């Protein structure tokens, strides 16, 4: 398999969605990888799966589904898709240091508390841990109650949207008035030109 960046290793190169328990990384006979959802869509239109990159054919016997294709072990080692019976994964994107997905075990009986050491990023000797940091309540916009500043900003945002809509309407009306005025001038000039050639009797 060609060298890929960590981003492209973690996402299907057809639909650009991250691999997950629903979109498992499936390995084709040609050693290219794409998600099970994309492969299933390709399979519905043809009997065999044709690789979108090298056009290599992966033969699937009758009654054999895409989900029975092998998972790509390299991708699984990085993303560590858990079995759904073990725990519910939480995926955190950390762009500052290149770590993109971090499955944390969440127990229904016990929540992850500040200071708890959480989990795995890479297998084997490359395991890393995460210290959960407490964020002050006023800086937690995703909590059930929105911070007071966000509540105060909401009417301001609506006001900005209304004022920008109103200014757009006013601009259209102003342009229409200018066009009508110019049309009036042109029509007036045309009527004056036709009057120059009328015969005036002197009698």
Swiss-Prot record:
<keyword id="KW-0053">Apoptosis</keyword>
<keyword id="KW-0458">Lysosome</keyword>
<comment type="similarity">
    <text>Belongs to the RNF152 family.</text>
</comment>
<feature type="region of interest" description="Necessary for interaction with RRAGA">
    <location>
        <begin position="106"/>
        <end position="165"/>
    </location>
</feature>
<dbReference type="GO" id="GO:1904262">
    <property type="term" value="P:negative regulation of TORC1 signaling"/>
</dbReference>
<dbReference type="GO" id="GO:0061630">
    <property type="term" value="F:ubiquitin protein ligase activity"/>
</dbReference>
<comment type="function">
    <text>E3 ubiquitin-protein ligase that acts as a negative regulator of mTORC1 signaling by mediating ubiquitination of RagA/RRAGA and RHEB. Catalyzes 'Lys-63'-linked polyubiquitination of RagA/RRAGA in response to amino acid starvation, thereby regulating mTORC1 signaling. Also mediates monoubiquitination of RHEB, promoting its association with the TSC-TBC complex and subsequent inhibition. Also mediates 'Lys-48'-linked polyubiquitination of target proteins and their subsequent targeting to the proteasome for degradation. Induces apoptosis when overexpressed.</text>
</comment>
<keyword id="KW-0862">Zinc</keyword>
<dbReference type="GO" id="GO:0005764">
    <property type="term" value="C:lysosome"/>
</dbReference>
<protein>
    <recommendedName>
        <fullName>E3 ubiquitin-protein ligase RNF152</fullName>
        <ecNumber>2.3.2.27</ecNumber>
    </recommendedName>
</protein>
<dbReference type="GO" id="GO:0070936">
    <property type="term" value="P:protein K48-linked ubiquitination"/>
</dbReference>
<keyword id="KW-1133">Transmembrane helix</keyword>
<dbReference type="GO" id="GO:0031267">
    <property type="term" value="F:small GTPase binding"/>
</dbReference>
<feature type="transmembrane region" description="Helical">
    <location>
        <begin position="167"/>
        <end position="187"/>
    </location>
</feature>
<keyword id="KW-0808">Transferase</keyword>
<keyword id="KW-0863">Zinc-finger</keyword>
<dbReference type="GO" id="GO:0008270">
    <property type="term" value="F:zinc ion binding"/>
</dbReference>
<dbReference type="GO" id="GO:0005765">
    <property type="term" value="C:lysosomal membrane"/>
</dbReference>
<feature type="region of interest" description="Disordered">
    <location>
        <begin position="140"/>
        <end position="159"/>
    </location>
</feature>
<dbReference type="GO" id="GO:0006915">
    <property type="term" value="P:apoptotic process"/>
</dbReference>
<dbReference type="InterPro" id="IPR045744">
    <property type="entry name" value="RNF152_C"/>
</dbReference>
<feature type="zinc finger region" description="RING-type">
    <location>
        <begin position="12"/>
        <end position="55"/>
    </location>
</feature>
<dbReference type="InterPro" id="IPR033609">
    <property type="entry name" value="RING_RNF152"/>
</dbReference>
<dbReference type="InterPro" id="IPR013083">
    <property type="entry name" value="Znf_RING/FYVE/PHD"/>
</dbReference>
<comment type="pathway">
    <text>Protein modification; protein ubiquitination.</text>
</comment>
<keyword id="KW-0479">Metal-binding</keyword>
<comment type="subunit">
    <text>Interacts with RRAGA (inactive GDP-bound form); stimulated by amino acid starvation. Interacts with SEC16A.</text>
</comment>
<dbReference type="Pfam" id="PF19325">
    <property type="entry name" value="RNF152_C"/>
</dbReference>
<keyword id="KW-0812">Transmembrane</keyword>
<keyword id="KW-0832">Ubl conjugation</keyword>
<dbReference type="GO" id="GO:0010508">
    <property type="term" value="P:positive regulation of autophagy"/>
</dbReference>
<dbReference type="GO" id="GO:0034198">
    <property type="term" value="P:cellular response to amino acid starvation"/>
</dbReference>
<dbReference type="GO" id="GO:0070534">
    <property type="term" value="P:protein K63-linked ubiquitination"/>
</dbReference>
<dbReference type="GO" id="GO:0031090">
    <property type="term" value="C:organelle membrane"/>
</dbReference>
<dbReference type="InterPro" id="IPR001841">
    <property type="entry name" value="Znf_RING"/>
</dbReference>
<dbReference type="Pfam" id="PF14634">
    <property type="entry name" value="zf-RING_5"/>
</dbReference>
<dbReference type="GO" id="GO:0006513">
    <property type="term" value="P:protein monoubiquitination"/>
</dbReference>
<keyword id="KW-0833">Ubl conjugation pathway</keyword>
<keyword id="KW-0472">Membrane</keyword>
<dbReference type="GO" id="GO:0004842">
    <property type="term" value="F:ubiquitin-protein transferase activity"/>
</dbReference>
């Amino acid at each position: 398999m060609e060298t890929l960046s960590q981003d492209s290793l973690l996402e299907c190169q057809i639909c650009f969605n991250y691999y997950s328990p629903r979109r498992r990384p499936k390995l084709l006979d040609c050693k290219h990888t794409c998600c099970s959802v994309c492969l299933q869509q390709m399979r519905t239109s043809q009997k065999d799966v044709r690789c979108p990159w090298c056009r290599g054919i992966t033969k699937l016997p009758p009654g054999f589904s895409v989900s029975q294709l092998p998972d790509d072990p390299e991708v699984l080692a990085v993303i560590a898709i858990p079995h759904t019976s073990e725990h519910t994964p939480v995926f955190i994107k950390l762009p500052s240091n290149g770590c993109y997905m971090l499955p944390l075990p969440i127990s229904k009986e016990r929540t992850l508390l500040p200071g708890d050491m959480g989990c795995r990023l890479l297998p084997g000797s490359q395991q890393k841990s995460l210290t959960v940091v407490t964020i002050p309540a006023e800086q937690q916009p995703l909590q059930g109650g929105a911070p007071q500043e966000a509540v105060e900003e909401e009417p301001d945002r609506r006001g900005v949207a209304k004022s920008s809509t109103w200014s757009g309407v006013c601009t259209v009306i102003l342009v229409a008035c200018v066009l009508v005025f110019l049309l009036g001038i042109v029509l007036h000039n045309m009527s004056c030109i036709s009057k120059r050639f009328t015969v005036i009797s002197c009698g």
